[in-house]
Amino acid sequence: MKANLGNLMKQAQQMQENMKAMQEKLATIEVEGQAGAGMVKVIMTCRHDVKRINIDSSLIGDDKEMLEDLVAAAMNDAVRRVEAATQEHMASVTSGLGLPAGMKFPF
């Protein structure tokens, strides 16, 4: 029984180290969200830090409301891409845990 508990503790510590390493890696991965056929782009890290927003010069001076909508859409696209990239990378860390399908980690 003690051997199993010791083994479990060792696995938990290794998992914690792997999670920390993955979080550091995710902080360096950038994704790009787009809207308006690429006329508005948002570059974001997998920590949800916005690095850049690129707006095509043809949109400057146009309808302010439309531009705001495009920026919001590009941000939302970037967030969805961050979530997908994060899940993909975290799958390598959590694959041996036997978590139920659809269960997100970290919770």
Curated annotation (Swiss-Prot):
Protein family membership: Belongs to the YbaB/EbfC family.
Subcellular location: Cytoplasm, Nucleoid
PANTHER family with a match to the protein in the record: NUCLEOID-ASSOCIATED PROTEIN YBAB (PTHR33449:SF1)
GO cellular component, one term: cytosol
Keyword check for Metal-binding: no
Function: Binds to DNA and alters its conformation. May be involved in regulation of gene expression, nucleoid organization and DNA protection.
Keywords: Cytoplasm, DNA-binding
This protein's record includes keyword DNA-binding: yes
Subunit architecture: Homodimer.
Organism of derivation: Nitrosomonas eutropha (strain DSM 101675 / C91 / Nm57)
GO molecular function: DNA binding
Name the UniProt record assigns to this protein: Nucleoid-associated protein Neut_0591
Gene3D superfamilies per record: Nucleoid-associated protein YbaB-like domain
UniProt xrefs under NCBIfam families: DNA_YbaB_EbfC
